[in-house]
Amino acid sequence: MRAKVELAVLLLVLVGVAAGTRPPSAPPPVTEDTLQKVAGSLEMYVDELPQMPKIYGFSMRHGHPSPIRLTIGMYQKKWKFHRDLPASTVFVFGTSAATATFPGPTIEAAQGVPLSVTWQNYLPARHILPWDPTVPTAIPRRGGVPTVVHLHGGAHPPQSDGSAFAWFTAGFGETGPAWSTPTYTYPNAQSPGVLWYHDHALGLTRANLLAGLLGAYVIRNPAVEAPLGLPCGDEFDRVLMLADRSFYADGSIYMNYTGIIPNIHPQWQPEYFGEAITVNGKAWPFLAVARRRYRFRIINTSNARYFNLSLTNGLPFTVVGSDTNYLSKPVTAASLLVSVAETFDVVVDFSQSTSSEAELVNTAPYPYPDGQAPNDLNGKVMKFVISPAKAKDTSRVPAKLLDYVAVAEEEAVQRRYIVMYEYEDAATGNPTHLYINGKRLEDPATETPRPGTTEVWEVINLTPDNHPLHLHLATFQATRVRGLVDEDAFKGCMAKLNDAVRCNVSRHAVGEEVAVPEHEKGWKNVVKIAPGYMTTIVVKFFMVDSGKPYPFDATAEPGYVYHCHILDHEDNAMIRPLKLIK
C-alpha cells in the first residue's frame, strides 16, 4: 500500500507539473516593512468579535438527540478581516457559498450520537496562494485545489480521519490514492469538549489553512456538564480561534512566493508568521463583557505562531480543560502558552477586574522559543470592554471536574523512541526539510500499536524549535521533560546510526528536569516538545474517559498519522504513519 501511494504521489507531481498545474504567478515583491505598514494601518479593537454560525450535528426526536447527515462545502469567496481593509479572497467552509465564513461554522455534536458529514469541494481550478511542488504534494492532473478534512482531536475510523492521501478536487473530479468515501462518520463517543476541523491535504495544509479551511467542533453532554455549573450559553461560552495573517494593501492574504533556499525549494519556508492577529476571522477584535464569569475555548489555528497569552488587567485564567478533555480539577494560571493546534478551555471572571478594559496580549517569541519578541502588532490579540455594572451570575467553577483513566505508565507494553530532525543546506545553513526518525511519510510505518494498549513514547527533539506533537486518534500526556547532556555527541551518533538506544540515550537524557505545568497534566492530543530535551509521553490507544475500546475498527486502512503541527514542518515532511494492528 505505501509503495503504491509513494508511486502515485510521484506520478501526480510529474504529470501535474507537466500539465501546467502550477502555483499562481507571483505578484511584485513585497517587504516585511510593507506588510507591517499594512497591518499597522488597521486600527485595533474596532470590529466586534464575531460569533460564528452554528450547525447542529443532531436532530431532536421525542426529546432525545438523533443522528443526522450534514453536507458542508468548501468555497471561494470574499471575507472582511477588518473594517479598514478591503475584502480578502479566502477558501472557507459553509452549507452554502453565501453562508460560508472564516473560520467555518461551529459544528455542535451530542456525545454518543454519531454524525455523518459529506464534505464537498467547490474550490476553483487554481489556488489563491503559492505552494511548492518540490515538497511531497497532492498535484491533480487536471487542475483544481486538493482538499481533505481532518477532525482534530476526534476518535473516529481511519476512513474518516482525513488521510493526506485521501484528497479530492471539486466535484470529486480527481481523488488521491487513499480516497474511499465522500462521507465521513464521527461517532462522538469521546468526552465532551472542543475540537476543530481543518484541511489535511498532502503538502498543502499550510496554504489551505492559511486560506481559511478551518472551523470549530464542540461535543456536548448536558447530563455530564450541567452539574459542573460552568458558564454556558452562546453569550457566555465562546470559542476563540486565533490565527495570524499578513495582508497586501488590496486585502489579499500574503504568503511568501520565494523559498528560503530557492534553488532547492522555490517557495517553501520553515515558518509563516503574520503581522495581524485575527480572532474568529477579525483582526484585533473587541468583545463587550459583563462583570461575571465567561468560558473561552481557545484554539490556536496559526501555521507556526505560538501564543503566550495574558490579560493586561491581571486577571488569571482558570483552566478547566485542554485538547478536548477536562482536567480533573481547575488550575489557575497567570498566562497560557498555546502551541500551534493546541486548545485550552478556560474561565475568566470579569467581576474581579479593577479596570474597564483588558487586552489579551501575546509575549511568545517567534519562532518559539528563541526567535524575536512580538512587536506592537503581533503582541496584541483582542480587547475585552468590561461593563461597569455588576451582573447576575449563577455559574461557578467547581472544585472537582471530570476524572479519566489514570496515567499508569507501568501498564505500557511498548517503549518507543521518536526523534525529531532538521536537515540543513551545507552552503547556507538554512533548513531543507524535517523528518521524524529520519523517515518520510511514504516510508513504511514503524509505529504499529495495538488497540486497547498503553505505550510510552520518548520524544527527543534535536532541532532548534519547539514542536507541537500531534497524534491522530490517540490520547496522551507528558509525564517528564529531561534535558540532553553532551548533545553534540548524541547528535553525531544519531546522524550515523539513527538509533537512540544504540546511541545510549539513557546516558544523555540526564540533564535538567523541567516540570510539566499543572494545567497541561491532562489527556491531550498536542504536546509541546522542547528543543534539547527528551519528553516522555504516555499514550493510550483506547477511550480515556471510559477506558473502553474504540467503537470502530481502528486497524482499517488507510491508518492514521502523527506529526509536528507547525504546518510548514508537517508539509516538509515532519509526519509519519501511525498504523494500528490487530
Curated annotation (Swiss-Prot):
Cofactor note: Binds 4 Cu cations per monomer. The Cu cations are bound as 3 distinct Cu centers known as type 1 or blue, type 2 or normal, and type 3 or coupled binuclear.
Matches recorded under InterPro entries: Cu-oxidase-like_N, Cu-oxidase_2nd, Cu-oxidase_C, Cu_oxidase_Cu_BS, Cupredoxin, LPR1/LPR2
Major enzyme class: oxidoreductase
Binding, Cu cation 4: 467, 564, 569, 574
Chain positions recorded as Cu cation 1 binding sites: 150, 470
Any one cellular-component term (Gene Ontology): endoplasmic reticulum membrane
One Pfam family per UniProt: Cu-oxidase_2
Gene3D superfamilies cross-referenced by the UniProt entry: Cupredoxins - blue copper proteins
Highest taxon of source: Eukaryota
Assigned keywords, A-Z: Copper, Endoplasmic reticulum, Glycoprotein, Membrane, Metal-binding, Oxidoreductase, Signal
Tissue and organ distribution: Highly expressed in roots, and at lower levels in basal stems and leaf blades.
Plastocyanin-like domain: residues covered: 285-354
Residues listed as glycosylation sites in the UniProt record: 256, 300, 308, 504
Primary site of residence: endoplasmic reticulum
EC number: 1.-.-.-
Signal peptide span: 1-20
Family as reported in the entry's similarity comment: Belongs to the multicopper oxidase family.
Protein name: Multicopper oxidase LPR1 homolog 1
Underlying gene: LPR1
